Amino acid sequence: MKLILTANVDNLGVPGDIVEVKAGYGRNYLLPRGYAIVATRGAEKQIEGIKRAQEARQIRDLDHAREVKEELENLSGVTISVRTAESGKMFGSVTADNIVDAVKKANGRSLDKHSIKLRKGDVKATGVYSVDVQLHEGIVASLSFEVVSA
């Protein structure tokens, strides 16, 4: 099945890419979630125009991503308060949503929770941690934050 991606899909492509996938994957996952549209001649021509506009925007976005990277790497005071037992063990774990909220409180910048590369179960105790934030293709910022007991 030939599809045109409308969203960034891991291990498949970026918006505007024309990909060949198995019919079930396309019909049951990509199309219902709006990650892709069926590739037709008209859609392919439309995508070419969109890609040209995206390339122009990408140059501006790259400069912006570099600025944000510098800002995030120099950011201090990112603190996440969590409930803990008397032994210091957390109830649950810190999620990407918690990190996004903490960054927003620290400097007012909103991040996409999907851009934070946090493996499930990584942060389960108090302490200082670091995560990678994918800002742009090839630009990854390292963000440090502290998890404290509330």
UniProtKB/Swiss-Prot annotation:
Gene3D superfamilies: Ribosomal protein L9, C-terminal domain, Ribosomal protein L9, N-terminal domain
Database matches in Pfam families: Ribosomal_L9_C (PF03948), Ribosomal_L9_N (PF01281)
GO molecular function list: rRNA binding; structural constituent of ribosome
Keywords of this entry: Ribonucleoprotein, Ribosomal protein, RNA-binding, rRNA-binding
GO cellular component, one term: ribonucleoprotein complex
Keyword Ribonucleoprotein attached: yes
GO biological process, one term: translation
Organism superkingdom: Bacteria
Family of this protein: Belongs to the bacterial ribosomal protein bL9 family.
Function: Binds to the 23S rRNA.
Protein's name in the database: Large ribosomal subunit protein bL9
Biological source species: Corynebacterium jeikeium (strain K411)
Species lineage: Bacteria, Bacillati, Actinomycetota, Actinomycetes, Mycobacteriales
Gene that encodes it: rplI
